[in-house]
């Protein structure tokens, strides 16, 4: 909180949502590794972007997808076990990959997703404890995130980037049904959504 409050409109020239993601080198030892990172213009990424991240192989970078769903039949015991498992999986992935993607895409009638906040927070703090957090970027692919508040909380819990795929797919579905302007492309839908999120985050 600032006093007077920051004005995102009048002070737009000095505000930025750019997100450098990936391994961070030691700032006390100048080297090319300090700039060997990905720079995003803002933290909300498209479905196409997340697919690029999943298949990344440029300049020695790679990614690892962690499924944050578990079988419904396993109940509470399965929930707790899965939470521990994803923390260990993230720790192992941090040794070989630069981007870790937390995804609930496999959620369905037989598989429940662990809350993206719970899984993200658990992994973020586990990697801090194992001194691995600065080695990787944490990207969240979640159907939960829809509103500005959801995005802000995920960022606060340690996310470097977020793909709110369900919100984007819903908008595309409404367009296909003729409820939204049928001339809108997937890219236009994403740009409009991302701009709305940016305005909300700045506020």
What is the predicted role of each segment?
Residues 67-69, 102-103, 139-141, 165:
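A cross-family glycoside hydrolase active-site/sugar-binding cleft signature
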Residues 102-118:
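Glycine-rich, proline-tolerant flexible connector loops at the mouths of alpha/beta enzymes
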């Amino acid at each position: 909180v600032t006093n007077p409050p920051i004005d995102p409109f009048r002070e737009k020239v000095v505000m930025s949502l750019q997100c450098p993601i990936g391994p961070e080198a030691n700032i006390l030892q100048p080297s090319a590794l300090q700039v060997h990172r990905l720079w995003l213009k803002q933290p909300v990424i498209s479905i196409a972007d997340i697919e690029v991240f999943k298949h990344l192989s440029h300049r020695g970078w790679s990614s690892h997808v962690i499924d944050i769903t578990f079988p419904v039949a396993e109940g509470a015991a399965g929930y707790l076990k899965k939470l521990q498992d994803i923390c260990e999986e993230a720790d192992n992935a941090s040794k070989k990959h630069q981007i870790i993607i937390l995804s609930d895409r496999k959620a369905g009638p037989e598989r429940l997703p662990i809350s993206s906040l719970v899984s993200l927070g658990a992994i973020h703090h586990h990697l801090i404890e194992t001194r691995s957090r600065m080695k990787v970027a944490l990207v969240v692919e979640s159907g939960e995130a829809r509103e500005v508040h959801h995005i802000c909380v995920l960022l606060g819990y340690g996310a470097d980037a977020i793909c709110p795929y369900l919100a984007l797919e819903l908008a595309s579905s409404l367009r296909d049904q003729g409820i939204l302007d049928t001339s809108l492309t997937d890219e236009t839908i994403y740009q409009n959504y991302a701009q709305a999120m940016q305005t909300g985050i700045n506020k």
